[in-house]
Amino acid sequence: MADEKQALLPIYAATDSTSHSKPQPQAPLELKSKTHRMLARGIHLAIASLMLIGLIYGGVFSHFTSSFRGCHDGRVTSHRGVVSDRTHLFLPYLAAADKDDDKKHLVTAKHGAVACDVPACSTLGTEILKRGGSAVDASITTALCIGSINSFSSGIGGGGFMIVKPAGDENATAFNFREKAGRYAHKDMYKSNPLLSKFGGLAVAVPGIIAAVSDHEHREMREMFDWLFDEQDLPLTPGARAFRPNLAHTLDLIARNGSAAVFYDPEGPIAPNLVRTVKSTGGILTLEDFADYDVEVGPAITALFRGREVATAPNPASGPILINGLNVLGGFEKPMQAPSDFEGVATQRLVETMKWMGAGRSQLGDPVDIDNSALIKEILDPKWADMIRTNISDDNTHPWQFYSPAYEGKDPHGTAHFSVLDADGMAVSMTTTVNLLFGSLVVDPVTGIVLNNEMDDFSTPGTRNAFDLEPSIYNYIAPFKRPLSSCVPTVITDLTTQWPEFVIGAAGGSKILTSVFQAIVRKLEYGMPLLDVVRAPRIHHQLLPDVAYLEMLAPETVRNELEKRGHTVKSIAPASTMNGIYINPVSGIIHAVSDYWRKRGQADGY
């Protein structure tokens, strides 16, 4: 049993475990972080993922540990970069399973739904909705559940972005709980050894998830905790194996305190252990860095597309680029006779817009040290989209220099996304990450937390890429700065009913942005059923490399049409996952679909 536990730990563990103090339960502490009031109840329900599923699914955990070895951006490969025998994960997609059989992955509901990568977590989130919890409650529960099971891509050692949109005329709110660099971070810290931004303690930024899912109000925490941890209800069976009791104890502490203070307090039971582990593996984070962490809460950025309001996450997420892309396509008339985005001129316009989006994204970045607000304003301006549209030809593409990228685009890594809708019409779109698989490969032996390597999403000066482009000055490392992200959690509202119509987001590194962009176009431009939006092959272009990547099983005509217009086209295995919810504005019927075809996800609803 001990050997099995050790085998699941990432390779960087603190070498001096004797210096760590065992976490002890504390009285409730006051939360210093000022997050949105609607998050107050969420933590009361969220720890359900602990014993109900997250920590007893050793088989699931070990399955993904082995299956995703050598994987980047959600794509299963061997260490030589070719598709390995582990493509069994994607067989339902690669084999073009019978469409009638696929219908079982379409969930139809009347009240609420959850769509995420892990079937058990969708079910657990839906159970929270059934018990009267809000979409935020269910989202927090789902996030912690995914982090317990799929800790290779998410967890409380990471961060992310969230969009919350209540029904009615209340505006959408954006929560930025992206990880932050510490006070001693600087732009040249990886110049001598770039690998240190990926592996070990120096790659770790201050996690943000717990700050986002907590609030200073304790309320019914004790009562809800008793329900979640009633030992008579635990779904343990003879022979069941729990691999991560230290993480269970950590989540226990957070649940009992009901606030983020227990996580970030310099004198608390968690932060000192994390700082010791980070420092013992080469890092520079301090207790003050944890104490100073805050969640940025503000209005989502919005735009109109085909008569709907699109709300998504602002800079340093890639929401401004998503809005820009929709502004570009929204100015075109729908191509005549085009039944989908995979049809001649429609595909050409889609890919050309993606190339312009790739150029614009290199100018995003947290404005902590360099103010890029004027650039962001220009990117969001419909006049900028008009200029781009006049430079898109229906007949041919151009060399990458034509699109004038200012800087090298940083290529990020894997994530987890889920979408939630409750009976009151509140929608939540949330994307979380630890960056690379198992983050920095550092796990704290006391708390059981797998720590992110989000510092790798920053740019390092002094180098040029193969295209002679410098790294983006807007994404250089600076103290307390958050790195650029491809995340674009999005909620789209029908302006007639004032109810959410489409809740969408994706996981998969640089392909997140283009996947969500294509999903919105497919659903709102071409009226594709949600099942087809999620399962159909996708196309990706990020300008550099100057290649259109086409997922397997895409019609050969798509390749032919693109090559005829001068594009270089390459086939790839499925490389991103989407989980979405669509609400019919007329009937109110809810459709929820998780990406079974790429990651075996399954939605749930009631």
Roles of regions detected by a PLM:
Residues 32, 57-308, 312-317, 363, ...:
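Noncatalytic scaffold domains of N-terminal-nucleophile
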Residues 40-68:
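Terminal signal-anchor or tail-anchor transmembrane helices
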Residues 363, 367, 461, 478-482, ...:
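Extended C-terminal subregions enriched in glycine
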Residues 297, 412-415, 437, 485-487:
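Short, small/polar residue-rich loop motifs at catalytic or cofactor-binding pockets
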Residues 92, 244, 266, 283, ...:
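Internal maturation/activation junctions in enzymes
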Residues 154-166, 416-420, 489-491, 577-583, ...:
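Short beta-strand scaffold segments in enzyme catalytic cores
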Residues 1-39:
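Short, low-complexity, Lys/Arg-enriched N-terminal segments of secretory-pathway carbohydrate enzymes
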